Amino acid sequence: MTVEQKELGRADILEIMKLLPHRYPFLLVDRIIDIDGDNAAIGIKNVTANEPQFTGHFPEQPIMPGVLLIEGMAQTAGAICARKAGTAGDLVYFMTIDNARFRKPVVPGDRVEFHVTKQKQRGNVWKFHCDAKVDGALVAEADIGAMIVNKEAQ
């Protein structure tokens, strides 16, 4: 990633892999755009038919499991937290899910945008509102909580 991209508030997959411990098949954010400091960001997930969840969910009519949409939201929020923490010894733990709603199915070929906005932060605890959108239409939403912990202190 170039310096210009960082100044514009973007993270490519290599930068995301530095921020998050997740790896295939559980890294659910391909790119992050429009990062506004620690206030908001948009994570991008390109949904493809060859992803392992579609083998069983559902073979005749593949639909992205809602829990994976929530996880994509949480990973986008986690990247915001990790950027703010800036310490290699820190991990971001997903703590809470509230008000989760699933509006429309997400299928292979869709490009999901995880719109994540910080609602509040107190110490190492963060609260976010998250919307998942496909082609501008709301497909899922949730309020999530996260906590930054030092992995050495566990």
UniProtKB/Swiss-Prot annotation:
<protein>
    <recommendedName>
        <fullName>3-hydroxyacyl-[acyl-carrier-protein] dehydratase FabZ</fullName>
        <ecNumber>4.2.1.59</ecNumber>
    </recommendedName>
</protein>
<comment type="function">
    <text>Involved in unsaturated fatty acids biosynthesis. Catalyzes the dehydration of short chain beta-hydroxyacyl-ACPs and long chain saturated and unsaturated beta-hydroxyacyl-ACPs.</text>
</comment>
<keyword id="KW-0444">Lipid biosynthesis</keyword>
<dbReference type="InterPro" id="IPR010084">
    <property type="entry name" value="FabZ"/>
</dbReference>
<keyword id="KW-0456">Lyase</keyword>
<dbReference type="Pfam" id="PF07977">
    <property type="entry name" value="FabA"/>
</dbReference>
<dbReference type="GO" id="GO:0016020">
    <property type="term" value="C:membrane"/>
</dbReference>
<keyword id="KW-0441">Lipid A biosynthesis</keyword>
<dbReference type="InterPro" id="IPR029069">
    <property type="entry name" value="HotDog_dom_sf"/>
</dbReference>
<comment type="similarity">
    <text>Belongs to the thioester dehydratase family. FabZ subfamily.</text>
</comment>
<feature type="active site">
    <location>
        <position position="57"/>
    </location>
</feature>
<keyword id="KW-0963">Cytoplasm</keyword>
<dbReference type="GO" id="GO:0009245">
    <property type="term" value="P:lipid A biosynthetic process"/>
</dbReference>
<dbReference type="GO" id="GO:0019171">
    <property type="term" value="F:(3R)-hydroxyacyl-[acyl-carrier-protein] dehydratase activity"/>
</dbReference>
<dbReference type="GO" id="GO:0006633">
    <property type="term" value="P:fatty acid biosynthetic process"/>
</dbReference>
<dbReference type="InterPro" id="IPR013114">
    <property type="entry name" value="FabA_FabZ"/>
</dbReference>
<keyword id="KW-0443">Lipid metabolism</keyword>
<dbReference type="GO" id="GO:0005737">
    <property type="term" value="C:cytoplasm"/>
</dbReference>
